[in-house]
């Protein structure tokens, strides 16, 4: 796997959110052109993107904010059990500290923080554009 693409409505806020989780922001880039239109099957596609990567350099997210064409469909916040790509997980050293910091960037808990069999301390939060992010603190 190379990276995961996440479409957001506010690229700057999404970058801040993932940087607060410990990822490293890379350069932003404006993308447009006929090849993009044809690949995405969108007319007049124009978007700005930025990659954020895990500190070890092995995991990448491509954050994308479309300028055109505008999205006109309905937006829903799917529950954790809906089919499809549902969440991305990050291992953190101190879940409580990360939660405290990330709430300043608009994150909200989906459920409750849980101790899973004394192996992991886990929670789901909603991040930019309603995506679910799982935070995991290894306990053992």
Predicted segments, located by residue:
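Core segments of cupin and vicinal oxygen chelate
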Residues: 7-58, 97, 104, 123-126
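A short acidic/small-residue loop/turn micro-motif
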Residues: 68, 117, 139-140
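Conserved SAM-binding loop
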Residues: 135-137
């Amino acid at each position: 796997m190379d990276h995961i693409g996440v479409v957001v409505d506010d690229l700057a806020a999404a970058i801040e959110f993932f940087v607060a989780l410990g990822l490293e922001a890379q350069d932003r880039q404006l993308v447009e052109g006929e090849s993009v239109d044809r690949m995405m099957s969108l007319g007049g596609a124009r978007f700005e993107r930025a990659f954020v990567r895990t500190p070890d350099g092995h995991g990448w997210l491509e954050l994308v904010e479309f300028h055109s064409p505008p999205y006109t469909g309905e937006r829903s916040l799917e529950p954790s059990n809906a089919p499809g790509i549902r969440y991305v997980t990050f291992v953190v050293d101190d879940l409580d500290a990360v939660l405290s910091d990330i709430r300043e960037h608009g994150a909200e808990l989906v459920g409750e923080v849980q101790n899973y069999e004394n192996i992991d301390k886990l929670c789901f939060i909603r991040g930019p554009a309603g995506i679910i992010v799982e935070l995991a603190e290894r306990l053992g």
